């Protein structure tokens, strides 16, 4: 290998020597196993490495400052001094005597790194370097290296390597005394081999001479001893070195045996050290000052543990702790101690014990982290202290009973409202938890006492207090127990404790609470109390379900009182709307919008609102009519829209929607024909809501009514153009609404005696209309007509907006001054009831254009009427409202009958559709299918009549073999 290559290799090895020390050591081990390339001298024998047996050491190995001591033993080397310099000096002197015959001065070496020199006659031989790390045990023997001098005597790691060119070693040397080797740090500076190899022109000659000498010499391979420091004690490992003669049969060995006599601790060191430690422990236990430095005590424990005295040390420590704890038990067996004083005494003992064990553990920390940690069966020093305290203090039956009873007594006092020392409770319960007896010794009794206390309290307070007050008390108790859990109870008790309180104060009284106070809370709309009720019931298993059932029963009962009582018909719909708003608010605010309560409310409304068939539907229709009629000043357009939305919610619950349709259509016709509709937009909005809810078929006729009104406007435009070409006397303006009979309600025709001017105008319009639409028939509905009259009174002229019947009555007074009831009836032909309502509106209302004699609110037979010339009013145009015709029983029955007729048609159609599809069906299945298709309730008797009617009309027949089965007839 060239000089530049060797220099480069040395530089790289110097840079990486620290990081790759372990890798270098591994490479050297492999090199030893494989053996070096065959040199011209005899092969090297592999060294023997016995397992390391660290000797006992009392003092620590000195550092680099002992470098000079090694030099005095082995001149020309750098290293640490041996613990036994006399033996090492003798060994070195003996080696020198064998090698002083022909040795030259060793070149200066670096203080950090040594180099071994060897000669080779082959031109391919290369220099090899070895780095040794003082921190790891060296197991690789040093390899021979080239040297610049022809003959050298060098030392490898504190061991001399002898070379001789004349006299072979005949004597077998043994080191019988103790010998300790010190390793050299691989970071030491590398000696400059390149300068030594090139310093003399005779380097090649010297190398040849050295090779010649090596042929007749034996090489001593020295082993490396490295010092390991662990826990302050020095451990050394040695290897055996051997000589190998260059000639077979003349090999001599230098055997260095392992240490026979290891350094021992001074006599009585263990006893004296333990005595110091014992005194320190007793001082801690007695709360007196410690004579020794804590660091010194810690070091003493470390020294004892390092010399395998850990087991005995642990036993002694346990014994002294146990003796001290046993001595504490007598103070707790006094019967005269008060429970609180006893608890304070046991707490003080526990606190002292914890403080003592912390200090003791800090001194014996090395023992705790080495010996105890390696023995899994042994408890740590802290756990040992807990075991001893539990075994000798708390496990004492008298002490434990008195402790638990005292704790329970303090908790009971606090529950009764007394002030207690909560920090004392927290400390004692923490002690029980640390000693792992909390659940077995305390928690079970604590929960039993809790159940007993709250069971009695619940029974007592349920009888004495009202529901709102009781609910607040329960909530307060739950908050108190939660605070105890946070303050001094263990968190493992939380679930059991809260469940116990909830069960005794709530779970055992769910039904009683609801039966006693739910109705009053709902009636009085006590939102906060209802919220608390729901919150508490949600904590108990099954509580919400019980509350839900009572909620349903309340809605059904309260709603039934609204619907069933006929006296409340006038206010039924408004009360239903108010009740619905109330329960919605309770659900949103108190029940947190629970879907179960929402669905239960809907089912309850549907149940009670249909207990009275047809009537709710009729009243809802009339209520809508009152809100959509002109003159309603109760709400703005936005409020009217919201009100209609609420009505539609109630409308969803009723079964008889066809009844609603019949009455709604009747009222809508009046609003459209008489012009009493408050807003066309509101009318169409309501129609849109009905269509969305019930479908297009439900509103088809209602939509047709609006279309007729639009077409009538177009026809009247054409009629006015037609009237311009007609020679009609007078200045009467006629407006006619053309209605399709199928869309509008059925009205009973009433023949009346119209004035001749009106009759003439009717004929003109009839001629005009039939001329455009041949084949059609007009039927006049005089009950729906209205007029505008101009009247003159003493105060002045007025315009009167009146119905057709009112117009006919007022026009009679152009012919006379006074008329009786019979005379007016005969002249106008108006039906008696209608005439009485007409006269009542003219003579008994707010705008009294007629005067009645005798005076009174009702129209009686024999009454006479005269024109009130003294009539006064601040308005020019006055609308005289006709007395609202109260629907008689016959008229209501007529409307209901029409609804029933429509239902019959729907039932017949449903039966035919089902039989046509199924062909053959039993009676029960047919009835079930019909119920599923119909949208209104049907009595079984009515359904049976419809089946018999279809059989009579040959739509279906009974099966001849099975009378309970029907067959469809195609």
UniProtKB/Swiss-Prot annotation:
Q: Where is the composition biased (Pro residues)?
A: 36-57
Asked whether the keyword Iron is assigned, the reply is: no
Functionally, this protein is described as follows: Core component of multiple cullin-RING-based E3 ubiquitin-protein ligase complexes which mediate the ubiquitination and subsequent proteasomal degradation of target proteins. The functional specificity of the E3 ubiquitin-protein ligase complex depends on the variable substrate recognition subunit. CUL4B may act within the complex as a scaffold protein, contributing to catalysis through positioning of the substrate and the ubiquitin-conjugating enzyme.
Span-the-membrane segments of this chain are none
Region described as Disordered: spans on this chain: 1-157, 189-211
PTM text: Neddylated. Deneddylated via its interaction with the COP9 signalosome (CSN) complex.
Indicate what this protein is called per its UniProt record.
Cullin-4B
The cross-link described as Glycyl lysine isopeptide (Lys-Gly) (interchain with G-Cter in NEDD8) comes at: 916
Please report the organism this UniProt entry assigns to the protein. Answer: Mus musculus
Q: Which InterPro entries does the UniProt entry name for this protein?
A: Cullin (IPR045093), Cullin_CS (IPR016157), Cullin_homology (IPR016158), Cullin_homology_sf (IPR036317), Cullin_N (IPR001373), Cullin_neddylation_domain (IPR019559), Cullin_repeat-like_dom_sf (IPR016159), WH-like_DNA-bd_sf (IPR036388)
Q: Where is the composition biased (Polar residues)?
A: 99-109, 146-155
């Amino acid at each position: 290998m060239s000089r530049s290559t060797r220099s480069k290799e040395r530089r790289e090895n110097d840079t990486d020597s620290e990081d790759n020390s372990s890798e270098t050591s591994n490479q050297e081990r492999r090199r030893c196993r494989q053996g070096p390339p065959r040199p011209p001298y005899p092969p090297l024998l592999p060294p023997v490495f016995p397992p390391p047996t660290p000797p006992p050491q009392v003092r620590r190995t000195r550092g680099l400052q002992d470098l000079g001591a090694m030099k005095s033993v082995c001149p020309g080397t750098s290293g640490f001094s041996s613990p036994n310099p006399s033996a090492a000096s003798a060994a070195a002197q003996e080696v020198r005597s064998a090698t002083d015959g022909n040795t030259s001065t060793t070149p200066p070496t670096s203080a950090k790194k040594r180099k071994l020199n060897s000669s080779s006659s082959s031109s391919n031989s290369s220099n090899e370097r070895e780095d040794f790390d003082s921190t790891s045990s060296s197991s690789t023997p040093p390899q021979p290296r080239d040297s610049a001098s022809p003959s050298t005597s060098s030392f490898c790691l504190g061991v001399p390597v002898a070379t001789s060119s004349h006299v072979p070693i005949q004597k077998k040397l043994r080191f019988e005394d103790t010998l300790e080797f010190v390793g050299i740090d691989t970071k030491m500076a590398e000696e400059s081999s390149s300068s030594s190899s090139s310093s003399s022109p005779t380097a090649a000659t010297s190398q040849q001479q050295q090779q010649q000498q090596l042929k007749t010499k034996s090489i001593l391979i020295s082993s490396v001893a490295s010092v390991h420091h662990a826990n302050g004690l020095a451990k050394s490992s040695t290897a055996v070195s051997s000589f190998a003669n260059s000639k077979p049969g003349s090999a001599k060995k230098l055997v260095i045996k392992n240490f026979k006599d290891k350094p021992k601790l001074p006599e009585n060191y263990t006893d004296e050290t333990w005595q110091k430690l014992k005194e320190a422990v007793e001082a801690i236990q007695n709360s007196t000052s410690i004579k020794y430095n804590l660091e010194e005590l810690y070091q003493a424990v470390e020294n004892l543990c390092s010399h395998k005295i850990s087991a005995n040390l642990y036993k002694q420590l346990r014994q002294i702790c146990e003796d001290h704890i046993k001595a504490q038990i007598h103070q707790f067996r006094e019967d005269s101690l008060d429970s609180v004083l006893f608890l304070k005494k046991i707490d003080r003992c526990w606190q002292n014990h914890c403080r003592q064990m912390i200090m003791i553990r800090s001194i014996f920390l090395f023992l705790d982290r080495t010996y105890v940690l390696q023995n899994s069966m042994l408890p740590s020093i802290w756990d040992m202290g807990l075991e001893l305290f539990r075994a000798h203090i708390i496990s004492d039956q008298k002490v434990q009973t008195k402790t638990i009873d005292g704790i329970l007594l303090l908790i009971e006092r606090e529950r009764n409202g007394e002030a207690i020392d909560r920090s004392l409770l927290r400390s004692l319960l923490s002690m029980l938890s640390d000693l792992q007896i909390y659940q077995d010794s305390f928690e079970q009794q604590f929960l039993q006492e809790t159940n007993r206390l709250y069971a009695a309290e619940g029974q007592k307070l349920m009888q004495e207090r009202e529901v709102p007050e009781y609910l607040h008390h329960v909530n307060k108790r739950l908050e108190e127990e939660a605070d105890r859990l946070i303050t001094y109870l263990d968190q493992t008790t939380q679930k059991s404790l809260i469940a116990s309180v909830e069960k005794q104060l709530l779970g055992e009284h769910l039904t009683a609470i609801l039966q006693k106070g739910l109705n009053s809370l709902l009636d009085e709309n006590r939102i906060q109390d209802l919220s608390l009720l729901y919150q508490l019931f949600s904590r108990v298993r099954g509580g919400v379900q019980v509350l839900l059932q009572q909620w349903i029963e309340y809605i059904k009962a309260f709603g039934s009182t609204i619907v069933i009582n006929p006296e409340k018909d006038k206010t039924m719909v408004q009360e239903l709307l108010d009740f619905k708003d109330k329960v919605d608010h309770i659900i949103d605010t108190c029940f947190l919008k629970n879907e179960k309560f929402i669905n239960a409310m809907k089912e309850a409304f549907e149940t009670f609102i249909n207990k009275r068939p047809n009537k709710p539907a009729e009243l809802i229709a009339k209520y809508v009519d009152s809100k959509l009629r002109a003159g309603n000043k109760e709400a703005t357009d936005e409020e009217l829209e919201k009100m209609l939305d609420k009505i539609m919610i109630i409308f969803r619950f009723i079964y008889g929607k066809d009844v609603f349709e019949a009455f709604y259509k009747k009222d809508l016709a009046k609003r459209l024909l008489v012009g009493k509709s408050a807003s066309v937009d509101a009318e169409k909005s309501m129609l849109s809501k009905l269509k969305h809810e019930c479908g297009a078929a439900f509103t088809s006729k209602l939509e047709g009514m609006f279309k007729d009104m639009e077409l009538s406007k177009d026809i009247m435009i054409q009629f006015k153009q037609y009237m311009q070409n007609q020679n009609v006397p007078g200045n009467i303006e006629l407006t006619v609404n053309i209605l399709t009979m199928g869309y509008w309600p059925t009205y009973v025709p009433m023949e009346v005696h119209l004035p001749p001017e009106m009759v003439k105008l009717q004929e003109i319009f009839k001629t005009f209309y039939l001329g455009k639409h041949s084949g059609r028939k007009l039927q006049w509905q005089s009950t729906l007509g209205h007029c505008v009259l101009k009247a003159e009174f003493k105060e002045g002229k007025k315009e009167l907006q009146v119905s057709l019947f009112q117009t006919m009555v007022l026009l009679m007074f152009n012919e006379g001054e006074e008329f009786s009831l019979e005379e007016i009836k005969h002249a106008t032909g108006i039906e008696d009831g209608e005439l009485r309502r007409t006269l009542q509106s003219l003579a008994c209302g707010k705008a009294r254009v007629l005067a009645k004699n005798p005076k009174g609110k009702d129209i009686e037979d024999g009454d006479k009427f005269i024109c009130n010339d003294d009539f006064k009013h601040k308005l020019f145009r006055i609308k005289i409202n006709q007395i609202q015709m109260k629907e008689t029983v016959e008229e209501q029955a007529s409307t209901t009958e029409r609804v029933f007729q429509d239902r019959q048609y729907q039932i017949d159609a449903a039966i035919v559709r089902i039989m046509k599809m199924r062909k053959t069906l039993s009676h029960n299945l047919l009835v079930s299918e019909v119920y599923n298709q119909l949208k209104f309730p049907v009595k079984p008797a009515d359904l049976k009549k419809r089946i018999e009617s279809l059989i009579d009309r040959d739509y279906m027949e009974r099966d001849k073999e099975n009378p309970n089965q029907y067959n469809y007839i195609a």
